[in-house]
Structures are given as C-alpha cells and as structure tokens.
Amino acid sequence: MNRISALILDWAGTTVDFGSFAPTQIFVEAFRQAFDIEITLEEARVPMGLGKWQHIEALGKLPAVDSRWQAKFGRAMTAADIDAIYAAFMPLQIAKVVDFSAPIAGVVDTIAALRAKGLKIGSCSGYPRPVMEKLVPAAAAQGYAPDHWVATDDLAAGGRPGPWMALQNVITLGIDDVAHCVKVDDAAPGISEGLHAGMWSVGLAVSGNEFGATWEEYQAMSKAEIATRRERAAGKLYAAGAHYVVDTLADLPEVIADINARLAKGERP
C-alpha cells in the first residue's frame, strides 16, 4: 500500500526528555571534570544529534571553546583529549539518563494511535549503547517502548548525519520502501539522516534541542517568547532540509495524513 508504514524516532527531545537536557548538562560536567574547562549549555547544544564522541570533537572546534582551550593548553584539542572527555562523559550520562527518561507529553497516546493504524515504531539515538541500555527500559516503564532501537555506536558505518541507523530500522522492521518511512528529530543531524536514507524528515521545533527549554519553562513562557523560539528552531530545521516542522510528536498524525495524500499522488520524499 502506498502510505506511511513506519516511523523512525529520535529519543532525547523527540520522545523523551523535553528540551533535551540530559546530554547537554553532562557535556558541561564532562569538560569541567576532565580538563577544568567551562562550556555553556548553549555551546553544548550546537552539535546536538551527532554521536557523543563526534559531538565532543565538534565542541572543541567551536571558535569560543577552541579559544578557551588554546588559552589554557597552548594547543588545539587532540583525539586523546576527546577520549578523556568521553571517558568522563560516559559514566555521568549512564548515571543521569534515567532521570530524563519520562516520555514527552502526548507521546504515549500518539504512538498508541499510530500503532492502531498499523504503523511500526523504529528509533535511533546519538547515545551510545551503554546509555541506551539504561534509557530504554526506564522509558518503557513509563509507557514508551518502540519496536526497535539503534544506538550511535552499533554500526560499523557510523551514526548521524549518515543514514545507517535509520536504514537498520528499515531492515529490522521489514519495511519495503524507505519512502514509506518518516524520520522525526529535533536536531539538524537527525533531519539529514532521514534525507540521506530517502525518507520524509519531520523536525520538532518546541520539544527539543533547538527550543532548549524545560517543560516547566515552556509552560511559563509568554506567547511572544514561544513564537520567537519556535521560529528560530523551525528555521534551523527547515534549513537542514526538513519536509515539515511541527511543535511536538503529538502533532505528527496530521503530518502523516498529508504525506499519505502526497504518496497517493505519486510524490516521493
């Protein structure tokens, strides 16, 4: 049938952890613990969506972070430095990720409704497997359990922005056409992942990394601030190539209905 048959969902900022705070705070702590270097939450968010080693590498190349690093050590960050920060990051992230495992509002009901229509639920993450092995059961205990998940270090080919994690979901779930899949993510590398895999890519402008607020902060925000942040986040996701941008996963059923109408007319991603 020429319609959407599977979703490939990101984790932090998409299905769990409103605002994607678990990884950002841990990057700040890991830089401080390993080398006594301060980075801001805003800096920590910039490369979000990449595998965590690659994320640390990208942080080291940010001009402001590189400047601080050069001032302290008289040289650029090396692969050995990245390894040391990653070594600090991993136990911190494993210890903390369960605290950020609650499904985002609307996720559990939306997934149930889409499953009732026959859709399969795949997922992938920038988290490495040891972190996912803590996160997945914690989220399941609170009502969110996808049919499959892939960690950023599972595949020899690598992670985002490449297509491999998304395509591994296609293989495992037995989906016969990548154009019948929707990749949903709150960060640019995940949008690129979906495009590279030949899928429809949908960005989430409010629940994730680009909006960058906790649920409580979001609830207390003025309409003007929400609009400003939403516009900024949506702009980044559209610039990455998103076919659609909505606020949260709860808005996805309307998008899927629109994509199904386009597929029926013979359109492809």
UniProtKB/Swiss-Prot annotation:
<feature type="binding site">
    <location>
        <position position="10"/>
    </location>
    <ligand>
        <name>Mg(2+)</name>
    </ligand>
</feature>
<dbReference type="InterPro" id="IPR006323">
    <property type="entry name" value="Phosphonoacetald_hydro"/>
</dbReference>
<protein>
    <recommendedName>
        <fullName>Phosphonoacetaldehyde hydrolase</fullName>
        <ecNumber>3.11.1.1</ecNumber>
    </recommendedName>
</protein>
<comment type="similarity">
    <text>Belongs to the HAD-like hydrolase superfamily. PhnX family.</text>
</comment>
<dbReference type="InterPro" id="IPR036412">
    <property type="entry name" value="HAD-like_sf"/>
</dbReference>
<dbReference type="GO" id="GO:0050194">
    <property type="term" value="F:phosphonoacetaldehyde hydrolase activity"/>
</dbReference>
<dbReference type="GO" id="GO:0000287">
    <property type="term" value="F:magnesium ion binding"/>
</dbReference>
<keyword id="KW-0460">Magnesium</keyword>
<dbReference type="InterPro" id="IPR050155">
    <property type="entry name" value="HAD-like_hydrolase_sf"/>
</dbReference>
<feature type="binding site">
    <location>
        <position position="12"/>
    </location>
    <ligand>
        <name>Mg(2+)</name>
    </ligand>
</feature>
<feature type="active site" description="Nucleophile">
    <location>
        <position position="10"/>
    </location>
</feature>
<keyword id="KW-0704">Schiff base</keyword>
<keyword id="KW-0479">Metal-binding</keyword>
<comment type="function">
    <text>Involved in phosphonate degradation.</text>
</comment>
<dbReference type="InterPro" id="IPR006439">
    <property type="entry name" value="HAD-SF_hydro_IA"/>
</dbReference>
<feature type="active site" description="Schiff-base intermediate with substrate">
    <location>
        <position position="52"/>
    </location>
</feature>
<dbReference type="InterPro" id="IPR023214">
    <property type="entry name" value="HAD_sf"/>
</dbReference>
<comment type="subunit">
    <text>Homodimer.</text>
</comment>
<dbReference type="GO" id="GO:0005829">
    <property type="term" value="C:cytosol"/>
</dbReference>
<feature type="binding site">
    <location>
        <position position="186"/>
    </location>
    <ligand>
        <name>Mg(2+)</name>
    </ligand>
</feature>
<dbReference type="GO" id="GO:0019700">
    <property type="term" value="P:organic phosphonate catabolic process"/>
</dbReference>
<keyword id="KW-0378">Hydrolase</keyword>
<dbReference type="InterPro" id="IPR023198">
    <property type="entry name" value="PGP-like_dom2"/>
</dbReference>
<dbReference type="GO" id="GO:0006281">
    <property type="term" value="P:DNA repair"/>
</dbReference>
<dbReference type="GO" id="GO:0008967">
    <property type="term" value="F:phosphoglycolate phosphatase activity"/>
</dbReference>
<dbReference type="Pfam" id="PF00702">
    <property type="entry name" value="Hydrolase"/>
</dbReference>
